[in-house]
From Swiss-Prot:
Residues 404-423, 445-465, 555-573 have a biased composition (Basic and acidic residues). GO terms for cellular component: plasma membrane. It is a multi-pass membrane protein. This is Uncharacterized protein MPN_335. The chain crosses the membrane at residues 34-54, 76-96, 120-140, 156-176, 187-207, 655-675, 715-735. Its main location: membrane. Keywords: Cell membrane, Membrane, Transmembrane, Transmembrane helix. Residues 424-439 have a biased composition (Polar residues).
Length: 741
């Protein structure tokens, strides 16, 4: 049977009018079908929900949600595309078979071939229009901050995905409708498509990913993202590190694995995962991949800690993180509504101690709504850097002045109280001395003589003990040149909130986060200026130079004051030592002569015994004095050593950067009373795993890792087209041979 009998009849005006009339009739029937509008609207609504509504409310990157390797958002839309294809196929191809219209048309007007292609044209026009509207909806994601290139890829992916899959499902339905009724055909198609589209998600919960296979064999993969020092808007490729680690499982300890080449490790243990091999028969992944073309594809958005398909990892070359990056993002958790970012600060332009090396933007509590910044939120923003740094520097110097004024007032108060106390002690001492010089009773001369000898001995022993310690309180000496952090933090936070007043709590939290990141960049420039005398041309160092000048001036004043106090203490200590030695040698002789005049009845043996005791006490005093001198010498050496170390400290820089470090790492809390629960937003730039991440960064190597598709996207699209055309031919022959009731 020829496709068109009497082809020349097509040129006949009557035949042409009949074809056009039938074409318009089918279009009108479709337009009047409210069910078809509902299903098409559902497809558009789901696209808007995933790519517009959810990102707008959650402040998440729509492209990140769409290209997630496990939670494939297109899986939610594909079943509704199948439903849309089912409804329109019923309206165009199937319903006429049941209402008797088809037998009328075939027997009196057209051949089945003409009828099939006329209906196919209507089907294609309607599906193309729906695909165009879907792409138009998706193009609105550009208003949410997505780059033009990624939006273009997303629009084309959605357009071709809706178009090809709708045609594919329609052809499948035409074929199976030859054997089943409408209800059975629809249920079979929808059930099969739903199971296929969610195959990847289902397998993700039942099969070990390659990363777990690596861990079982003693290797820990970490996935990183970076922002390069080029300060461009583009985000570089993914970094990955393979870290050889101890295996806690006794079964795995038996395996002696010694490998240093990350490519060999991944090839042996990563790609051997069953999840990788099931890619070849995972039909759901093939149809889902139509919605993630070019920059959205898996081989450009892979994460070694998650499941990914159709991707071969290539460890290209080692990366010098100190020279290449400002931030490296540890993607610890990459789920739909629970994301956590950490940022590694390189050490080549920041002091190791004053500033934290790990920065995190996190919201405490998994049950709370997350605020996750996009990469553009942590880019260098010169106007913001300049503004935040000026506020910070001005607040630093004002806090320093306030603190010094408070310290001066406190010291004056302490000196006044000490003077009053010394005056009171002096009066009490005079009273005691006047009482002790009164004449003693002659009958108690022996007892008094013994007491005087004992007191002179104890005075000689205690003279060294009463000497003030040579080393002063160095922490007090140096720490007084400091900043009152509590007042600084309160003042600085107030200024920042005043700048962002009028915003919602959520937006204010995001702005404060950007301010913290801007301050990080400013501190990096300030450190370059401090250390290398490099002017960035962005920040103004006027306030910082004032702070440094005042800081060093105050430190010099305290140094001179401390030196004067120390010299006075040394002189006083020397006078006390000389007076104590004189008392030890003179007083016993005077007392003995007085005792000899008053009591001449003492025998010679008692005198010799007493002399021997005095000699023994004198030797003990000398020993104690030598010991105290040794201790004093040690104290002097320690003090000199501490002074030398203190001179090497960049004191102004320490105060400045330490204050900045505390503020960067301190949490910034925001509370918002919502309709259902209180929302809490916490902004801080310090990760609890700082030490762990520092060790990872210090002891392991980083590599450029690129993804290479196992099967190219062009091949995938070509295969889907071939399958669709094959099913189209099959549906044509099935339609030709269908019995008419």
């Amino acid at each position: 049977m020829k496709l068109f009998k009497n082809w020349s009849d097509v040129n006949n005006v009557k035949q042409r009018q009949l074809l056009l009339a039938y074409f318009r009739f089918i279009l009108k029937q479709i337009v009047k079908s409210w069910l078809l509008w509902v299903t098409a609207g559902l497809v558009l609504f789901l696209l808007a929900l995933v790519l517009l509504i959810i990102p707008a409310f959650t402040k998440q990157d729509p492209l990140f949600l769409w290209s997630h390797p496990v939670v494939q958002m297109s899986s939610l839309i594909i079943p509704f595309i199948a439903l849309f294809a089912t409804i329109i196929t019923f309206q165009v191809f199937i319903n006429g078979y049941y209402n008797g219209l088809e037998i009328l048309l075939i027997t009196r007007f057209f051949t089945r071939g003409r009828l099939f292609f006329a209906r196919l044209a209507v089907l294609f026009i309607w599906i193309t229009g729906t695909a165009f509207l879907s792409g138009l909806f998706v193009s609105l994601t550009a208003t949410l901050g997505a780059t033009s290139q990624t939006v273009t890829d997303l629009v084309l992916s959605v357009f071709f995905g809706v178009l090809l899959l709708s045609l594919l499902f329609s052809c499948v339905l035409i074929i199976i409708a030859q054997f089943l009724n409408r209800t059975q055909s629809m249920l079979l198609l929808l059930l099969g498509v739903s199971l296929a589209s969610f195959t990847t998600v289902i397998l993700a919960f039942s099969i070990k990913p390659p990363s777990e296979n690596l861990r079982d064999n003693g290797y820990q993969p970490l996935n990183l993202s970076l922002i390069s020092k080029s300060k461009s808007k583009s985000v570089e490729n993914v970094f990955t590190i393979i870290d050889s680690s101890n295996v806690s499982d006794p079964r795995n300890k038996k395996k002696s694995i010694v490998k240093t080449n990350p490519q060999a490790i991944w090839d042996e243990y990563g790609e051997s995962s069953f999840f990788q091999s099931q890619y070849y028969w995972n039909v759901g992944y093939w149809i889902n991949s139509l919605f993630r073309l070019n920059s959205l594809s898996d081989y450009r958005n892979f994460d070694v800690n998650l499941y990914f398909l159709n991707t071969k990892l290539n460890f290209d070359r080692e990366v010098d993180t100190d020279k290449m990056v400002d931030f490296v993002s540890f993607r610890d958790q990459r789920h739909l509504y629970f994301l956590s970012y950490s940022f590694f600060i390189n050490t080549h332009n920041l002091p190791t101690q004053p500033l934290p090396r790990i920065l995190t933007y996190d919201n405490n509590g998994a049950f709370l709504e997350k605020i996750v910044p996009s990469f553009d939120d942590i880019k260098l923003d010169p106007p913001r850097v300049k503004k935040v740094y000026k506020f910070f520097s001005d607040t630093i110097i004002q806090s320093f002045r306030d603190y010094e004024a408070e310290e001066k007032e406190r010291q004056e108060k302490e000196e006044k109280e000490k003077a009053e106390k010394d005056n009171g002690n002096g009066q009490d001492s005079n009273k005691v001395n006047s009482v002790s010089t009164e004449p003693n009773n002659k009958n108690s001369s022996d007892a008094d003589s013994k007491d005087n000898n004992d007191s002179s001995d104890s005075q000689g022993k205690d003279s060294s003990k009463s000497k003030p310690k040579f080393r002063p309180r160095l922490p007090q000496f140096f720490d007084r040149v400091s900043i009152n952090y509590s007042k600084f933090s309160s003042s600085f936070n107030t200024q920042l909130k005043h700048i962002h007043q009028g915003l919602s709590t959520r937006d204010e939290a995001m702005e404060i986060f950007k301010d913290k990141v801007a301050l990080f960049y400013a501190l990096s420039m300030a450190y370059d200026n401090f250390t290398f005398q490099k002017d960035s041309g962005i920040i103004d160092n006027t306030s910082l130079n004032k702070f440094k000048t005042e800081f060093n001036k105050k430190q010099k004043e305290l140094t001179e004051k401390n030196k004067q106090k120390q010299d006075g203490k040394d002189q006083k200590s020397q006078r006390m030592t000389q007076g104590a030695d004189k008392a030890v040698t003179v007083e016993p002789k005077a007392m003995q002569s007085e005792i000899g005049m008053t009591d001449q009845t003492n025998d010679q043996s008692s005198s010799e015994t007493k002399d021997s005791m005095d000699s023994s006490d004198s030797s003990d005093t000398v020993d104690n004095t030598d010991e105290s001198e040794d201790k004093q010498s040690e104290e002097e050496e320690k003090f000199d050593e501490e002074i030398e170390n203190a001179k090497k400290m960049p004191k102004a820089e320490d105060a400045f950067f330490n204050t900045a470090s505390i503020w960067l790492s301190s949490p910034f809390l925001f509370f918002e009373n919502g309709a259902k629960r209180e929302q809490r937003y916490e902004i801080h730039l310090l990760n609890s795993n700082t030490q762990v991440n520092n060790e990872i960064i210090k002891t392991n190597s980083f590599y450029y890792v690129s993804g290479e598709p196992i099967v190219g996207q062009e091949v995938i699209i070509a295969m889907v087209l071939v399958v669709t055309l094959g099913l189209l031919v099959g549906s044509f022959f099935a339609y030709q041979k269908r019995d008419i009731k």
